Amino acid sequence: MPKRLDINTILVIGSGPIVIGQAAEFDYSGTQACQSLKEEGYKVILVNSNPATIMTDTATADKVYIEPLTLEFVSRIIRKERPDAILPTLGGQTGLNMAVELAKSGVLEECGVEILGTKLSAIEQAEDRDLFRTLMQELNEPTPPSEIVHTLDEAYEFVKEIGYPVIVRPAFTLGGTGGGICHNEEELIEIVTSGLKHSPVTQCLLEKSIAGFKEIEYEVMRDANDNAIVVCNMENIDPVGVHTGDSIVVAPSQTLSDREYQMLRNTSLRIIRALGIEGGCNVQLALDPYSFQYYVIEVNPRVSRSSALASKATGYPIAKLAAKIAVGLTLDEIVNPVTQKTYACFEPALDYVVSKIPRWPFDKFESANRTLGTQMKATGEVMSIGRNLEESLLKAVRSLELGIYHLELNHLKELDKETMKKRIIKADDERLFIVAEAIRQGVTKEEIHEWCEMDFFFLQKIENIVNMERKVKANVGDMEVLREAKEMGFSDHYIASAWNKTECEIYATRKENGIMPVFKMVDTCAAEFESATPYYYSTYGDENESIVTERKSVMVLGSGPIRIGQGVEFDYATVHSVWAIKEAGYEAIIVNNNPETVSTDFSISDKLYFEPLTIEDVMHIIDLEKPEGVIVQFGGQTAINLAAKLAERGVKILGTSLEDLDRAEDRDKFEAALTELGIPQPVGKTATTVEQAVAIAEEIGYPVLVRPSYVLGGRAMEIVYRQEELLHYMKNAVKVHADHPVLIDRYMVGKEIEVDAISDGENVYIPGIMEHIERAGVHSGDSIGVYPPQSLSAKVKEQIIENTIALGRGLKIVGLLNIQFVVFKDEVYVIEVNPRASRTVPFLSKITGVPMANIATKVILGKNLVEQGYETGYHPEDNEVYVKAPVFSFAKLRSVDTTLGPEMKSTGEVMGKDLTLEKALYKGLVAAGISIPTHGSVIITVADKDKEEAIEIARRFHEIGYNLLATAGTAKSLTEQNIPVQVVNKIDSEDYNLLDIIRQGKAQFVINTLTKGKQPARDGFRIRRESVENGVACLTSLDTTRAILRVLESMTFSAHTMKEIAPTTRHEVVHA
């Protein structure tokens, strides 16, 4: 069937900000889909609220709207643009829910817009638990015994019949939000209540737990002619019971017999046909390891996290083809872009093993509940490819960037058998490592299997790794053993420590003895046809398939897995850098290991190496390719941290030199540079012992900001107000010694300003200055940023521009730099300088129209700013106002404190733009998921130091008609100022108290500032968590509260009594 000619304009709905459960995979699929539709000659309109992505670049679609993904705003765009159709299946859960909402509101019918890809009925059949169950019964496909409930009482009835454990799955939610496994009544009450709250239709499915079955996924495609194929099947190493986004996954499946494989394949194809999906779809199945009994767990009628993984694992571009199918093309008409010879109806074949390991945020959230269940907690993932499972798994472990080079964690060596048993039974993020540790300590595979039901095949593979460790240790210097260990994926780092040598020595020994990897191509067809993809992985074997060309090449290091503090913004900069390298006439080589991103799409660079970002793995590629140099400033801290090791090995680092990178990152050298340039900074010193830290803090005076040097995303930073807090920090947050000093600064309560600039060492061009709404002390990634700045005097702005130019020149920066200033009593101080791409590059590039990463790359390659048409100075400001607002994933992470501070906590960002600050803020807040009702109640409980500021805020809430609720202490200070307030009980009171008000949805906002002494037992922590669990906006910064007030005041009309007319006396009347 040829493509449809009755439609011209297609609206593509993006997936919005990055949250846990919906990360960069939709930037990748959305970008592919838009390009794919444009190739076919359609006019593409895109709406998405996330400014950090390639997808929202103006080149991706014909028209790009960065607006909130709400019914109100999307409807407005549909009425204005009048598209013929919308394609929602590439925008994740957000896109699907949006399509359902638009259809129900009647706007699609009113404007004559049809839904492409997956019909509305199919979305509802797959997402609505009741309809899905009915469909499965019609197809005679088994699902676990289950019951749809709308209330807690209905849940009790079901459990009486079926018994514990049961799994709770809320309808229409993302990444299992609100769901979980219940083993007893207490858990049932908590999880069902939370599930009903999170489901937009107040509906949960309760099903008998089949935890322990094998979890298998099939990624399938179907077209309008009913051709259907399996692109990839995957197996979770973790059995059913852990969310697939939190599971370690291998592809192709490793433990299925042919009969099992075909049985599940047929089921998957039968389901996609019954749903009538045209495009991609993901089917999750549970298989009893001891019989042929299986159950269908769920179906995602859209492109998903698994399809991004399947695309990268096979090389078969699912999203690109799903978009073509949506407009009527069929699989037998579409050429597979990888081989450029075969058609898309050939099922991919793999001659390698792929492993995916999730990347969790627990290194940032020490207190979070680490247990894994049916609710997803990972922020990102890594993928690696090898010729055997052991190699593939160990490469994935190295890719995680947790400073781990092997399947072992030192702190687990102390665990006794009982503790290991507990942690293996109840899965957490370290289970794989604990299993390896248990095998090392002689626990049998049978016992481990009994604890966690992991398949014996996988346990055997882990045992093979442990046996090889013993062999390596027993045969120091044996070349045959070295070769065997390398074939199994062992790192030089591990072998070096076992043989008591340095990593460089092991590398050199291997080189002398010819034990070096070769690079193999990913070609979708197991080398059956010739292939045109420059997409490679390393392994130890015979033939090298990566052909080095005559052209000069430049290598860019990517930023690895998405985690808090290092998000999709860095991938954006990486991709733009690669494009600029190609424009400059070089061959662009990229090294990265994140399957979700645009940068790991083989069509972006000239050569893609899917490898861990460790010194050993990167050096193998450099030895083969011999590039002109390596660019490290776009890969976040990951790449910067490799710079010194690369330079030691004689690799040329392009851009800012290593000495200058160090001058910006090393505290003492940086201070010296600032003093030399005459630029002020907050008083601060470096401590290498606890005693020193105490003395410094006494000298400069509390409050002080403490942090380790060389960090990203403000890890382990804190503001401390007195000595015992400082001691607590030094003991718990950091291990201080001469190599890892701790920085102690005077904390200034000032306005924070952020600047991004491009420097060629001589000229410095400043695209934009951003003002933060939250005062200094809240991490810049968690602050609301505003461009152009709204409250800076001309003098201060001038000072900021001068300082930026002086720093670019003085630090000899070549490429990008990002500076954070604090303005305190009208004086400008420098807090820090980052000599690399920052997380604001995409945002500023889009709003100023200055392609920062592109210009910076060309500067790095030797073309100065003047030659590119840019002068030293500040880019003219726009008359529109742009707001960048952070988005958090607290609902997914139990027991994490939501207070904002110097440690970054947000996972994503959105943008709001309009003609006034108030309107732009409104859009930014709404896009970030904060509802802004014009009336209601606000609970105010603040720390003593904030009482004065809170009075003015309370008065403004009262003026616009909000009802004020406060606990006794805060209420007293409000009453004294004649502000009417209703006193509510503190949370330790038995009677109706503050938490009850939040639980019953009777408060629209909660304003709660931190009382120091961060034990979770504190009232504040419980108030903040309760707000998150109940979807109430909880404001922990009075600056954010003021911003929301500005919006509310601009939306509501004021109501004031008339002025009294003063009585006039006769002689005041003037006669004409």
Curated annotation (Swiss-Prot):
Mg(2+) 2 binds at residues 298, 300. This is Carbamoyl phosphate synthase large chain. Its EC number is 6.3.4.16, 6.3.5.5. Pathway: Amino-acid biosynthesis; L-arginine biosynthesis; carbamoyl phosphate from bicarbonate: step 1/1; Pyrimidine metabolism; UMP biosynthesis via de novo pathway; (S)-dihydroorotate from bicarbonate: step 1/3. Mn(2+) 4 binds at residues 832, 834. The gene is carB. The keyword Manganese applies. Mg(2+) 4 binds at residues 832, 834. CDD domains: MGS_CPS_II (cd01424).
